[in-house]
Amino acid sequence: MPELPEVEVVRRGLQDHVVGKTMTAVRVHHPRAVRRHEAGPADLTARLLGARISGTDRRGKYLWLTLDAGAPTTGRDDPDAALVVHLGMSGQMLLGGVPRAEHVRISAVLDDGTVLSFADQRTFGGWQLADLVSVDGSVVPAPVAHLARDPLDPLFDVDSVIKVLRGKHSEVKRRLLDQQVVSGIGNIYADEALWRAKVHGARVAATLTRRQLGAVLDAAADVMREALAKGGTSFDSLYVNVNGQSGYFDRSLDAYGREGEHCRRCGAVMRREKFMNRSSFYCPRCQPRPRR
């Protein structure tokens, strides 16, 4: 699943190419892609038609296009709605040529002739229109309002998150994946952050010191910035940027996917174990497993 860096790469691509453009045609090719839009495909296409894209934004793994959606019918120019995009496991926001037809779920033609396509092989992602609401001093779409800030958010409060984590009597990795504690971190970057901080993901969050938790959160921010600079992490063709290009941070991973390889820090053999229906990768020497 795309995590924060991958979603931010897509957002930046959209920011450069679609802001200021108006949707002149919209077509839903597969109803599952708009299942979160309760009013249905016809309502979504009708409301998007003529809407001007005024900006792009993101929180955690969600991105959205702010729209002057009221302009065609009310004459207002203020952004009052958002097109929320969740990439799910394999969603792609692509510009230009249409990708393989069987995977295109939604397409929109912009007033300069650009085609914006949402392709999704596994159909877990989708689009929905939502009202914008004010939460913690930020304006976000209503479906995103429950998410915590992410480590790359300028208003991310490390001390507050540490306080929340120290009150949790469950594994620290479980809490890092909790999008209501800190958003944007998924399995890959959780493992990378824990490896950098020399903390095993099975450690109970409440038993870690403030310094240890701060090191984990700082590492998460650092590794995601590095991944962002390299276009994100791509293990297959399911994650690409708006031009259909893969990221290459997978070559720089220190923990995730490295079972049986030597730890780049101490030389021990990296291990994998099951965790929350996922796999966790760690160094048994740098990140000793807690005693039960």
From Swiss-Prot:
Biological-process GO terms, alphabetical: base-excision repair
Pfam family, one: Fapy_DNA_glyco
UniProt EC number: 3.2.2.23, 4.2.99.18
A Gene Ontology molecular function term of the record: damaged DNA binding
Cofactor note: Binds 1 zinc ion per subunit.
Keywords noted in UniProt: DNA damage, DNA repair, DNA-binding, Glycosidase, Hydrolase, Lyase, Metal-binding, Multifunctional enzyme, Zinc, Zinc-finger
Start-end of FPG-type zinc fingers: 254-288
Cofactors (names): Zn(2+)
Signal peptide: none
Catalytic activity entry: Hydrolysis of DNA containing ring-opened 7-methylguanine residues, releasing 2,6-diamino-4-hydroxy-5-(N-methyl)formamidopyrimidine; 2'-deoxyribonucleotide-(2'-deoxyribose 5'-phosphate)-2'-deoxyribonucleotide-DNA = a 3'-end 2'-deoxyribonucleotide-(2,3-dehydro-2,3-deoxyribose 5'-phosphate)-DNA + a 5'-end 5'-phospho-2'-deoxyribonucleoside-DNA + H(+)
InterPro entries, per the entry: DNA_glyclase/AP_lyase_DNA-bd, DNA_glyclase_Znf_dom_DNA_BS, Formamido-pyr_DNA_Glyclase, FPG_cat, MutM-like_N-ter, Ribosomal_uS13-like_H2TH, Znf_DNA_glyclase/AP_lyase, Znf_FPG/IleRS
Residues annotated as binding DNA: 103, 122, 168
Catalytic residues (positions): 2 (schiff-base intermediate with dna), 3 (proton donor), 61 (proton donor), 278 (proton donor)
Role according to the record: Involved in base excision repair of DNA damaged by oxidation or by mutagenic agents. Acts as a DNA glycosylase that recognizes and removes damaged bases. Has a preference for oxidized purines, such as 7,8-dihydro-8-oxoguanine (8-oxoG). Has AP (apurinic/apyrimidinic) lyase activity and introduces nicks in the DNA strand. Cleaves the DNA backbone by beta-delta elimination to generate a single-strand break at the site of the removed base with both 3'- and 5'-phosphates.
Family the UniProt entry places it in: Belongs to the FPG family.
Subunit comment: Monomer.
Full protein name: Formamidopyrimidine-DNA glycosylase
Name of encoding gene: mutM
